[in-house]
Structures are given as structure tokens and as C-alpha cells.
Amino acid sequence: MAENRGNLTSYRPDIKVMDCTLRDGGLVNNFEFTDEFVKDLYEANVAAGVDYMEFGYKADKDIFDEKEFGKWKFCKEEDIRAIVGENDTPLKISVMADVGRTNMKRDIPPKSESVVDMVRVATYINTIPAAIEMANYCSDMGYEVTVNIMAISTAGENELDLALELLASQSKAQYIYLVDSYGSLYPEQVRRLADKYIKIAEKYGKSVGIHAHNNQQLAFANTIEACSIGVSLLDATVSGMGRGAGNCYSELLLGFLRNPKFNIVPVLKFIEKHMVPLKASGVVWGCDVQYMLTGQTNQHPRTAIAFTKAERTDYAKFYTEITGDE
């Protein structure tokens, strides 16, 4: 993988883009997307040359009530097929499985029975053994697999080193993900972490991906910084739609990448048709002061999300609440 390192303007044919609009964006609107929205997003991604499209979660119906969420919280096979048919396109279909929140043996069929190509296993650093078990199960079922270690900004250096070595050496995942869950990392930190991930991953023939959040308006900067180091699977969402402050903007990333296979125009047309009216309807996401503050203090954005829902604007008081500082 060392040969894939370069600078911000290097042409990298190994780079792949993952659209996470439905999955991360679903955390904003409870996964209540219309079929037209999903179908048009799928077609836009195909036309734009995007490599993977994440449809949502494989959530356990015994834990989450189907009546309380849109269908992309559960990603049933028939619902995906209603959008993509047999998916006779270069675009690959992905779903996310949360450790402890997915019944993998019941809800993840053999690849031969599914139009899904990739399962992304989401884990915290203290559940790595369970993530390895899930990753290996999905690999044995015939899927491409990633393992996404969340909230790494709160992990100790030795703890992270041990987790990465264990994951890289014992899992059958093709990708290990650097995830800035709190949007607290800066490009210099991302560069150091990406270098660490790559050095461990490449020992075992694996690659590295990145999933960034935009609390400090650094999701794009952090994504391309990781890319310049050699990270090759890049997550993005249309209009940055995602939990709280959102994610790296697809349109920013596609416009930046030096690869003629990518075409930004289909994404721009999708924004015109769907994202502008979605925001106008009152669906809220994106960087704001409260998300900036949780990012700067390396905290989960749940307090900022509650602040937003309450339509508060007392930012100084909020800062005191989350830090204890007057």
C-alpha cells in the first residue's frame, strides 16, 4: 500500500468512494426516505461513478421496533431489490451491521441469496472480539467486509495499537476504517492515525477506509488528508447529510478526486431535486456552533443534537453544561 501514498493532487486509481447518505443521513430523519428519493440516489451514484452505496443498517428487529423507523434501518432484501433489481451496474451495495445490534445469523443470508455486496461491521474498541466474529461470519457468507472502529478519538494509543493488530491479524475484513465519530480530529492527527492504520493493515494484506464527521468543518479536509497518505475507501454523503454536523460532502469529494470515472453532474441534479426541498421541509443537519463545541471537546454529539431539537441558541450556557467551565 505504500506505493499508493502521494500528495493531495496525486492520481490514485485505487481510490473508491462510498456513498453513506441513506445510512448516516437516516440518523437525521429516522430513515424515512421515499422510494423515489432512494431510487434517484441509486441512479445518481451509478451515473456519478460512485463505487459503493450504503443502504442503511441491518438492525435487529428484536431490539428496534420496525414501526418506529423507516425501512432502511433494517435493509430487508426485498426492499433493496425493489430499488436496484439485480443491480446490473458497477455500483456495489453495502449495509452496516452494528456489533450487539444485529442478528447476523438470522438477518445476513449467504451472498448467493443477496444483492448486497459488502457488510460494514461497526464496533467500539472494547468489542473488537465480537467484531472479528461478525466480520469472519460475513466473509464466510461471501461478502466483502469492512470493520469500522468508532470513536477512536477517545482511545488510548496502546489500546488502539492492540485493537488494530488484533483486528488486522484475526479478521477476514478487506478494510479497516478510521472513524472520527465525534468530528474532533484535525488533519495532522488524521495523518498520524492513517499512517498507523496503514502500517498495521498492509502487514496482513488489508486496506484502510475513512469516515469523517463535520463538527469542525474538517470532514473534507480530513478525508483528503487520509487519502494522500494512502487510505483508499472514502466515505461521503450528498450535501453532507448525516448525524448532527454531517459528513464529508460527496460533491466536494467527487469534484476533487483526479479520476475521470467520477462525474459530479448527476449528484448536482440530485441535490436540486431532493436535497434542497428536504432541507426546506425542516430536516436539519450540518455544522453549527453546538456541534463545533462537542467536536472541540471530543464528546459524543448527543448533547448537541438535543440542543438542536430544543431550538436553543444559548451557546455559552451549553458550553458550560458540557465542560463545567464558566
Please provide the spans of the model-predicted regions:
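Catalytic cores and adjacent flexible loops of soluble metabolic enzymes
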Residues: 1-326
